Regions:
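Short boundary motifs at domain starts and secondary-structure transition points
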Residues: 155-158, 178-181, 215
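Oxidative protein folding and maturation machinery
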Residues: 16-174
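Surface-exposed alpha-helical segments enriched in charged/polar residues
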Residues: 93, 204-211
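Short active-site neighborhood of thiol/selenol oxidoreductases, capturing the structured segment around
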Residues: 176-207, 222-224
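Bacterial Sec-dependent N-terminal signal peptides
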Residues: 1-21
């Protein structure tokens, strides 16, 4: 957070000294001195990030646009969700009429927020990009189908959604089925990979948690460990 605060401070200082600070493509927003709170500064930066960008020209340099997009994402975890979503909506609306640019942003968003190797994984933020991308109707049919599937999976797995019914096979070979039970306090469904250290550690943590064990014993919580 300290380094990001210094970045924001540096942008303001540079703006005062030189009149503007750029990222190689366009002028970055100049955060007013009157905004001193870190969260508020992040909000301003995210909300006004593309104000000086000519998005019809920015995509001519894909490398620079990639760097600009990464810088755009960098402060989002520290900004308010409503500010972030409004900024994404506005940005995507300005890009929406150019199919190749939409596909470029779609690939960037997936690699930055959703892929296994993503440095900043956020289903909610990626879903916001996806919803805007799908609205454009500018994708090829294979990509449209791909992103529609991702969108459906993410929407259905958000907090508060009800998991679908499914059948499974127990370790002893017997069959079982999961059906949503509204009388349960909670249901935990863990998708695990046998022999995977992260899966094993997650199960051990649950087993070792006293409060969880008591909730399971009382029947208020059910835990399913499923190996797809």
């Amino acid at each position: 957070i300290i380094s990001l605060f210094l970045l924001l401070s540096g942008l303001t200082a540079a703006a005062q000294a030189n009149g503007a600070q750029t990222n190689g493509l366009f002028q970055l927003p100049m955060i007013p001195d009157s905004i001193s709170n870190f969260n508020s500064r992040c909000n301003y930066f995210v909300a006004h990030y593309w104000d000086f960008a000519d998005l019809k020209k920015c995509f001519s340099s894909r490398d620079k646009m990639t760097d600009a997009f990464d810088q755009y994402l960098a402060l989002m975890p520290y900004a308010d969700a409503d500010v972030v979503y409004a900024s994404v909506d506005k940005f995507m609306q300005n890009v929406s009429k150019r199919p190749t640019d939409v596909e470029f942003i779609a690939n960037l968003a997936e690699s930055r927020m959703y892929a296994d190797t993503a440095a900043f994984q956020s289903d909610q933020l990626y879903l916001r990009f996806l919803d805007n991308i799908l609205k454009t109707k500018k994708l090829t049919k294979p990509l449209q189908s791909r992103y529609e599937l991702q969108s459906s999976q993410l929407h259905n797995s958000q907090e508060g959604m009800v998991a679908p019914e499914f059948s499974y096979t127990r370790l002893d070979g017997s069959k079982g089925s999961y059906r949503p039970d509204t009388t349960q306090f909670a249901t935990i469904i863990m998708l695990i990979k046998p022999g995977d250290s992260n899966s094993d550690m997650a199960r051990l943590r649950l087993d070792a948690d006293y409060k969880t064990a008591q909730l399971v014993k009382s029947g208020r919580v059910k835990i399913y460990c499923i190996a797809p």
